[in-house]
Amino acid sequence: MSYRSFSFLPNIDQNSVFSNRFNQIDKIFSTLTGEKPLSDTPAYNLFQIDEHKYELILSIPGYEEKELDISVHNSQLTVQGKKQNQENDDKKIKKYLHKGIIFNDFSLNFNFDHKIQVKKAELFSGLLKINFECRVPDEEKPKKIFINIPNKVKEIEKNKI
């Protein structure tokens, strides 16, 4: 099972040399050793539509709705995929000449600063689109505290001086 976590920490610019450094290192070693890359998690895009609305799009071709699980717990969004019929398909085939399409189980966790509410999830043409909102609860918003100084306190202080 592959696993990837996401957080709203400041990220490096996409055009930066370091923006995709781990995937690039993984691909270099995979090419040198002939092994498959370690990062088998689905590719995804995360968009901020406005101040509170977000859209997450995952590329998961070959997965059906019943093989996917989307859950929210507090401020964490989890998307999991588990292929069900892969073993039966492999038994029907005598010998692979090349096997480049691999359906691994995956789990993606996205941690946000505040609780989120999923509004809609759609699966179309191998893309899972999840629309959600992330709002700061009123009790967690910063509040301005005003300081009142009554006139009597000012007068007493003037008399003492």
Swiss-Prot record:
Give the matching Pfam families. HSP20
What InterPro entries does the record tag this protein with? A-crystallin/Hsp20_dom (IPR002068), ACD_IbpA/B (IPR037913), HSP20-like_chaperone (IPR008978)
Keyword terms, alphabetized = Stress response
Question: The sHSP domain covers which part of the protein?
Answer: 35-150
Coiled-coil ranges per UniProt: none
SUPFAM superfamilies in the record: HSP20-like chaperones
Gene3D superfamilies recorded: 2.60.40.790
Q: State the similarity comment.
A: Belongs to the small heat shock protein (HSP20) family.
Q: What is this protein called?
A: Small heat shock protein ibp
Gene (UniProt): ibp
